[in-house]
């Protein structure tokens, strides 16, 4: 359960990172 939770957090961070990269690229 803890491992799955950590993996979800990592995936969420990747999505946020990709979104930030897209915003920065547009700027």
From Swiss-Prot:
Q: What is its main location?
A: periplasm
Q: Where in the cell is it found?
A: Periplasmic flagellum; Periplasm
Sorted alphabetically, which keywords does the UniProt record give?
Bacterial flagellum, Periplasm
GO cellular component assignments: periplasmic flagellum
**Quaternary data:** The flagellum consists of an outer layer composed of repeating units of FlaA around a core that contains one or all of five antigenically related polypeptides.
Family the UniProt entry places it in: Belongs to the bacterial flagellin family.
Report the function annotation for this chain: Component of the core of the flagella.
Q: What is this protein called?
A: Flagellar filament 31.5 kDa core protein
Species per Swiss-Prot/TrEMBL record: Spirochaeta aurantia
């Amino acid at each position: 359960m803890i491992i799955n939770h950590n993996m979800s957090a990592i995936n969420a961070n990747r999505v946020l990172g990709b979104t930030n990269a897209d915003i920065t690229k547009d700027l």
